[in-house]
Amino acid sequence: MTNSGALDTKFHALIQDQIRSEFTASQQYIAIAVFFDGADLPQLAKHFYAQALEERNHAMMLVQYLLDRDVEVEIPGIDPVCNNFTTPRDALALALDQERTVTEQISRLASVARDEGDHLGEQFMQWFLKEQVEEVAAMTTLVRIADRAGSNLFHIEDFVAREMSAAGADPTAPRAAGGAL
């Protein structure tokens, strides 16, 4: 079923690492959502529960890509996640840092695919690059709104309810193994 020799590329090894990063991001967003739920901030909680599913779907898109390329896939464990936040802004800042880190990882994946002459891999990464521009922009805006709102958390809740509702499935997104949730 799988070609174990295909994992010999640096790009495929980095995809395996990225699967771990995406699953970790999913769990981190669940931890952030639970924090917001516990603080009675339902709009922020709902937003981050949805973000957790999105990150899970990203991991499964990477899995599907490796399966489609006949590369053996190993589902990894995850890195530790942070569960303790002093303020809602701290949780949002962590989410922004996480998105910036993922952007660096995705950019590296695209560069390695190009360096290795893996045109299929490079093309596959283009959707993720576009997605990261959107994710960093959204988290940057959310942190700025939190800064402007100060201690009035209802302003943040109102903004999230009004401006950050789910956009629906992206028809250009890669297929996720097992289907997107």
Curated annotation (Swiss-Prot):
GO biological process annotation, one example:
intracellular iron ion homeostasis
- Where is Fe cation 2 bound in this sequence? 55, 99, 132
Q: Which InterPro entries match?
A: Ferritin (IPR001519), Ferritin-like (IPR012347), Ferritin-like_diiron (IPR009040), Ferritin-like_SF (IPR009078), Ferritin_DPS_dom (IPR008331), Ferritin_prok (IPR041719)
Any idea which UniProt keywords this protein has? Answer: Iron, Iron storage, Isopeptide bond, Metal-binding, Oxidoreductase, Ubl conjugation
Gene Ontology cellular component list: cytosol
The answer to keyword Nuclease applying to this record is no
Q: Where in the numbering of this chain does the Ferritin-like diiron domain appear?
A: 5-150
Q: At which residues is the cross-link Isoglutamyl lysine isopeptide (Lys-Gln) (interchain with Q-Cter in protein Pup) found?
A: 10
Q: How does it assemble?
A: Homooligomer of 24 subunits that are packed together to form an approximately spherical molecule with a central cavity, in which large amounts of iron can be stored.
Family per UniProt? Belongs to the ferritin family. Prokaryotic subfamily.
Q: What is this protein called?
A: Ferritin BfrB
